[in-house]
Amino acid sequence: MNASSNVSNVEIANKIASAAALFRKYFPDASVNFSPWDNTNESMQDTIDFAFHFPGWSPLIECRAILLQLRIENDGNGRVPKLLGIIMRGMIVPSERWRVATIGDWEMTGTHLPQKEQKDNLILVCKELYKLFSTTSAGNKN
């Protein structure tokens, strides 16, 4: 679900804004889109989705945009949802170039992987997102 559609109170709005700022701390050239989907349907309510667009294709990160999906468990009580996992996809229209998921071994896969420094920064973003949501998330070993 679009990040903008998940805002139901100030605490959730703060977490969403902080998540975007955290990403931009490591990738300051990226612009954030809080509504990456044209429409949001009921089947996507278990995610908070962002898109981060770069001013052009970046050979360092091997993409033009990154789709960031925060997998959540929302109990419907208006509190900040529990963060279950993170999926990032490096995209060049119309295809995915790489992906990393925080389920399993956190291994980055794909046909065109980012440079080491950018890979390390993407993993740091994931770790810091877990810290950001730690008030409602179960502990994560990474």
What do the predicted segments below correspond to?
Residues M1-A51:
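Charge-rich, low-complexity N-terminal segments
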Residues K25, D29, P36, F52-G56, ...:
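Intrinsically disordered, low-complexity regions enriched in small/polar residues
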Residues A30-G85:
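Amphipathic, interaction-prone secondary-structure segments
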Residues L67-N142:
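Intrinsically disordered, low-complexity regulatory regions enriched in serine/threonine/proline
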